[in-house]
């Protein structure tokens, strides 16, 4: 069985084609700059070589068509005919309260998803464009939606509600939803397989640290809390996002700077975080280089970034009533040992002891990085959201 996974952003489409008998990726790539000058498709050939194909891609349907044609092209193809694709799985960002698991996409589901557009005005309409594009080109192929918010739907009300007038929740659905759910679900399940333990009875803290970052508290395989909120702006300090901030500071800045809602949203989402504090970059690799050169603001940004992660681990250990496993994933979590080392430093009182020698060698691979006598297992698990989307799609087809 072959499943195509699509992740459609406002001006991009990432794709992976899986052969589910072996769970192998047989083709992958992405389109950037849809609707802009200089749009292109970048693909990875089976031998690992990368190719860039330039083409004018004014909108998503033409983009999806370009991807499908590339998949069957004599030069770069991975399959002989589009009939070999059994289904398409989509990453859908915001499922609101409607979706707590992955679903087969039909008219009714898509209407309910579109009703959540308010909650993710950038992402949801782009996700829908991808679904509609596939429907237009391959009308008979089954499509499945896998929601970023679904895994967090098990949070109790006292964890997801904001302490604002209750009508705001009733009228507009203002509450905490959380994101990166597909990643948190994948790694929390995978770490139990890796360690050979039953998810039931385990208290796990998963740290998805990338350009965007979130942490989840997971008990018995179910999410009980997560750091992101109504939008991905809450919680950790991120590449360009502020994370937690006093709402009073928001109105104060708006007044002083004469900003409207779009202006303040832009400031908090795109100009804050690591970039805003360091003035160097939103990329942690560039930040570490600046720290090594003694850049004081970069050093401050790094300290703030790690401190916020550490603080939430402590909070979630309290919420869970203890912790058995702490897991790092995401671009930074998987590849930067400095981040893991700083976050776990001086946490022996919680039973967390890192093996710094082992930790320093681990990059993008599954590994236990705590000492043999550490009460808490600290583990690195590379995330694979696309594989989980493909697996969900296959499971739903079998039903």
Swiss-Prot record:
Site description Transition state stabilizer, residues in chain: 180, 241
Magnesium keyword on record: yes
Cellular component, GO annotation: cytoplasm
Keywords: ATP-binding, Cytoplasm, Kinase, Magnesium, Metal-binding, Nucleotide-binding, Transferase
Residues noted as binding ATP in the record, renumbered to the chain: 14, 208-212, 283-285, 331-335
Cofactor: Mg(2+); Mn(2+)
GO annotation (BP), single: acetyl-CoA biosynthetic process
Record InterPro entries: Ac/propionate_kinase (IPR004372), Aliphatic_acid_kin_short-chain (IPR000890), Aliphatic_acid_kinase_CS (IPR023865), ATPase_NBD (IPR043129)
Pfam short name (any one): Acetate_kinase
Subunit structure: Homodimer.
Family: Belongs to the acetokinase family.
Listed name of the protein: Acetate kinase
Organism: Bacteroides thetaiotaomicron (strain ATCC 29148 / DSM 2079 / JCM 5827 / CCUG 10774 / NCTC 10582 / VPI-5482 / E50)
Organism lineage string: Bacteria, Pseudomonadati, Bacteroidota, Bacteroidia, Bacteroidales
């Amino acid at each position: 069985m072959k499943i195509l996974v699509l992740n459609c952003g406002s001006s991009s489409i990432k794709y992976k084609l899986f052969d589910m008998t072996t769970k192998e990726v047989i083709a992958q790539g992405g389109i950037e700059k849809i609707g802009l000058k200089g749009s292109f498709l970048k693909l990875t050939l089976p031998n690992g070589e990368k190719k860039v194909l330039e083409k004018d891609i004014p909108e998503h349907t033409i983009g999806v068509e370009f991807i499908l044609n590339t998949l069957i092209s004599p030069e770069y193809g991975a399959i002989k005919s589009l009939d070999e694709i059994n289904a398409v799985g989509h990453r859908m960002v915001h499922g609101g309260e409607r979706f707590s698991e992955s679903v087969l996409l039909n008219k009714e589901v898509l209407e309910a998803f579109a009703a959540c557009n308010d909650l993710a005005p950038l992402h949801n309409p782009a996700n829908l464009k991808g679904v509609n594009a596939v429907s237009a080109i391959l009308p008979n192929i089954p499509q499945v939606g896998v929601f970023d918010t679904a895994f967090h739907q098990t949070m109790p009300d006292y964890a997801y509600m904001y302490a604002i007038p209750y009508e705001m929740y009733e009228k507009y659905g203002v509450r905490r939803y959380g994101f990166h759910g597909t990643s948190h679900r994948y790694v929390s399940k995978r770490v139990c397989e890796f360690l050979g333990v039953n998810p039931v009875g385990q208290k796990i803290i998963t740290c998805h640290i990338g350009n965007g970052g979130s942490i989840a508290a997971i008990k018995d395989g179910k999410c009980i809390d997560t750091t992101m909120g109504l939008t991905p702006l809450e919680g950790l300090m991120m590449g360009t996002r502020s994370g937690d901030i006093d709402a009073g500071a928001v109105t104060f800045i708006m007044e002083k700077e004469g900003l409207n809602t779009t202006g303040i949203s832009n400031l908090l989402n795109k100009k804050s975080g690591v970039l805003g504090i360091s003035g160097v970059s939103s990329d942690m690799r560039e930040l570490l280089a600046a720290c090594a050169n003694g850049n004081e603001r970069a050093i401050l940004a790094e300290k703030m970034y790690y401190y916020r992660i550490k603080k939430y681990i402590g909070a979630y250990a309290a919420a869970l009533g203890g912790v058995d496993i702490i897991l790092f994933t995401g671009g930074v979590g998987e590849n930067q040992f400095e981040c893991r080392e700083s976050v776990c430093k001086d946490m022996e009182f919680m039973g967390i002891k890192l093996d710094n020698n082992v930790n320093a060698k681990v990059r993008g691979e599954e590994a236990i990085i705590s000492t043999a006598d550490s009460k808490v297992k600290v583990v690195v698990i590379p995330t694979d959201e696309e594989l989980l989307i493909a697996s969900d799609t296959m499971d739903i087809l079998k039903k």
